[in-house]
């Protein structure tokens, strides 16, 4: 399933996850004081994307730690 809201070619592997990703993006942007959109800088947008990645990795690591115990 492709994300039709953006012009990238990233594919979402879990159906219905786009809404959760968008919510996380908005929450992080608010925390960082970033206004997302075409007029914001790539640095500001990138900081939000980087934080999303960090949080998703942290969540996955927590889940994996739970499975290995």
Curated annotation (Swiss-Prot):
Site entry: Cleavage: 27-28
Coiled-coil ranges from the UniProt annotation: none
Gene3D superfamilies cross-referenced by the UniProt entry: Small, acid-soluble spore protein, alpha/beta type-like
InterPro entries reported in the protein's UniProt record: SASP_alpha/beta-type (IPR001448), SASP_alpha/beta-type_CS (IPR018126), SASP_DNA-binding (IPR050847), SASP_sf_alpha/beta (IPR038300)
GO molecular function, one term: double-stranded DNA binding
Top-level taxonomic group: Bacteria
GO biological process, one term: sporulation resulting in formation of a cellular spore
Family of the protein in this entry: Belongs to the alpha/beta-type SASP family.
Additional notes on this entry: SASP are degraded in the first minutes of spore germination and provide amino acids for both new protein synthesis and metabolism.
Described purpose of this protein according to its UniProt entry: SASP are bound to spore DNA. They are double-stranded DNA-binding proteins that cause DNA to change to an a-like conformation. They protect the DNA backbone from chemical and enzymatic cleavage and are thus involved in dormant spore's high resistance to UV light.
Identification of the protein by name: Small, acid-soluble spore protein 1
Source organism: Sporosarcina ureae
Lineage: Bacteria, Bacillati, Bacillota, Bacilli, Bacillales
